[in-house]
Amino acid sequence: TNSQINSYQEILEDLTNTFPMKRLLQGDVGSGKTVVAAIAVYAVVKSGFQVAFMAPTEVLAEQHLKSISEFLKYSDIDIYFLSSSVKDRDNVMESISTGKPGLYIGTHALIQEKVLFSNLGLVIIDEQQRFGVDQRKKLITDSDIVPDQLVMTATPIPRTTALSIYGDLDISSINELPPGRKEIISYLFNGLKGDSNLVFDKCKEHLNQNSQIFVVCPYIDESENSDIQAAEI
């Protein structure tokens, strides 16, 4: 889309500057933020540097691993995955410490004390609002050089609000959906037990249309302190 093109052009221009990039990339789920990030990854790794891509959960990190691996499958870029459950963790750690150029995708495992990047050119943080300030800074401050920073969020943030909260970041927005991508419709229920049938009816309606549905609940188990419906119920 045009907004994707504008976004990656802004990022590539930042990467050529003599000072580090600090940019926020925002766009709805499905708007194509990951492919824009993949373009930045390609540019930085082909320049001989490492890229650290941190996501808040292992599930989300694995999704990025799958998506970016598909985008870059015809390139010669090495892609590594680091989490607490990775079997070849020692090999990944060695590649990190020796400065081997490549993309390193992971969770909080990327900011553990033993993880020391020696050739870090770009840090990408997805859903950055789910990380603490100290966690976000750790990747940058532990590096031998000051890397470029790209943070991504699917949370809609008005530009004036974004400037007040992230005043030190330039902002790129993807406000168009790729061709063929359906608009995502959100429904909000009070969460009381009486809403269950309404939720189930809405799920049946979309399942009959062969649609995907995400149901988000505030609790996994029932809480004694609240009458809100739990996910397991």
Predicted regions located by residue number:
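Inter-lobe coupling/hinge segments of SF2-like helicase ATPases
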Residues: 1, 9, 16-233
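Short, conserved phosphate/pyrophosphate- and ester-handling motifs at nucleotide-, phospho-/glycolipid
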Residues: 4
